[in-house]
Regions:
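N-terminal leader/linker segments that precede catalytic domains of diphosphate-processing enzymes
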Residues: 1-61, 72-124, 163
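Nudix hydrolase/Nudix homology domain
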Residues: 1-2, 14, 63-66, 107, ...
Length: 163
C-alpha cells in the first residue's frame, strides 16, 4: 500500500529525503514517514515421507493450475505458526518439520510471501471449504502441474534442486 494521505490525521503527504532511503511519503503535521506497506503471507510445499507434495485446486485462485498451501499471517502470529495453522486448516495435515526456503515478493498483490517446506506423515486429507480438491504428486512431477514461473512453481523447483 502506498500512502497519499496520512492515515492518522488525513493530511496530504509530501515527500521527504530520509537517509539512504531517498524520498519517502511524509506527514508534515504528524512529523512521521509513511513507508509503503505490504501484506505478509506464507506459501508452503507440504511434503510427505514418500517424497510427494500436496497440490491443491482452489478455483477462486486458479481454474487451470494447482497451487500450494498459502495464507495470510494474523496479527501476533509467527510465520511458522501460520504455516502450521494453514496446513491443518486447508488440508488437515500435521506439520512435523518446517524449513524456511526463500521469500518471494509479489508486487501485483502488494504481498511478501515467505516460502517453506513443511514435512508431514501422509494421512487422509480433510479439506476446508476454500479447497476444491487436493492430491499427492511426486515432487519431481509437481512443477508440470503448477503455473510455470509462479511462486508455487519457484518454491517447488528450489526444494527439488536442494534435494
Amino acid at each position: 500500500m502506498h500512502f497519499t494521505y496520512c492515515p492518522h490525521c488525513g493530511t496530504k503527504l509530501t515527500e521527504k529525503g530520509i537517509g539512504d532511503e531517498g524520498l519517502i511519503p511524509y506527514c508534515e503535521h504528524c512529523n512521521v514517514p509513511l513507508w509503503d506497506m505490504f501484506t505478509t503471507s506464507i506459501i508452503t510445499a507440504v511434503v510427505n515421507e514418500q517424497g510427494e507434495v500436496a497440490l491443491l485446486r482452489q478455483n477462486y485462485v486458479s481454474t487451470t493450475n494447482y497451487v500450494c498451501v498459502a495464507g495470510i499471517m494474523k496479527l501476533g502470529e509467527s510465520a511458522e505458526d501460520t504455516v502450521i495453522r494453514e496446513v491443518k486448516e486447508e488440508i488437515g495435515q500435521d506439520v512435523e518439520k518446517l524449513e524456511f526456503i526463500k521469500s518471494y515478493p509479489y508486487p501485483k498483490k502488494e504481498m511478501l510471501m515467505l516460502g517453506y517446506k513443511a514435512t508431514v506423515q501422509k494421512k487422509d486429507f480433510h479439506l476446508s471449504g476454500e479447497v476444491d480438491s487436493v492430491e499427492w504428486v511426486k515432487l519431481e512431477d509437481a512443477p508440470n502441474k503448477l503455473r510455470e514461473g509462479g511462486i508455487a512453481w519457484q518454491l517447488v523447483k528450489t526444494i527439488i534442486e536442494r534435494s
